[in-house]
């Protein structure tokens, strides 16, 4: 069957020297140069640099070594840790691989991966700040510390933790809708813990070990909620749902996810684009772009409120939430309207660019996208 990617546990407890020297080259040799790997660098602090110790921090593992160490692994581990600890957070490498450039923040550039370790990470600092989407969004100012933050895996809660807590995320349906809209449109790869789409075990202890039955924790068995039948007919489309899975699918958040998945799939810039806030006036407003030989995907996004976007590339912009269309000249502006309510968004795609055939409205199931 094969393997699409590796999720590597407890990365923080293994020296980066060992990853760069042994593990990553071996995995790449087996899986190919583009084989995706991401690791859990569990830091449990709100800041990017874990108590000011660079080699125990999340971004650190996305970089190659920058000094030579002993051929003896046991010695090299100590040398590497001491060298980088003494260098400190302020002397770590930085990158603009995540960022659109140019005078107006509209220009995509080829990422420079010459110093990338080949290991990506769960965005633990963002996870720890995910009390709400706005607070998580505030972490973007630290993205330059990662080799390329667009490869970060982003989640709200997991089998171990919720944001800044040992519980599954306790937020209500509106909070989850906003979180999902943010994760599916901003940089990074969204990851959803099982059951969060129906707020399964919301607020429960994530893990009590032998101190409590699993049923009382966030690791409880979820299978009862997906019993029944359903026929998948296309991506995000299904018929003939019955039993418990029918009730699960009819919840507002799964319907919200149907639309978000379709939207993300239709717009390459949302999947893997660089981003900028330049010329984006809104509480959570940004633009993203991705360019390769076949596509030039440029999109404007505002979440939970209206925004004004200025100094934009010329073209016809179509909002996949409402179907609204606006045509502007080079350097023109777009002002959104009607974007209020938790989880709501306006997502305008420049359909005049190469490979961006968006006919109109995509959203049709979510009660939040309107």
Cite the ranges covered by each PLM segment.
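Short acidic/polar inter-strand loop motif in beta-rich domains
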Residues: 355
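Active-site clefts of carbohydrate-active enzymes
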Residues: 149-170
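Short glycine-/polar-rich loops that comprise or flank the Walker A/P-loop
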Residues: 187-189
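Active-site-proximal helices and loops of the catalytic beta/alpha 8
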Residues: 4-148, 152, 171-173, 179-185, ...
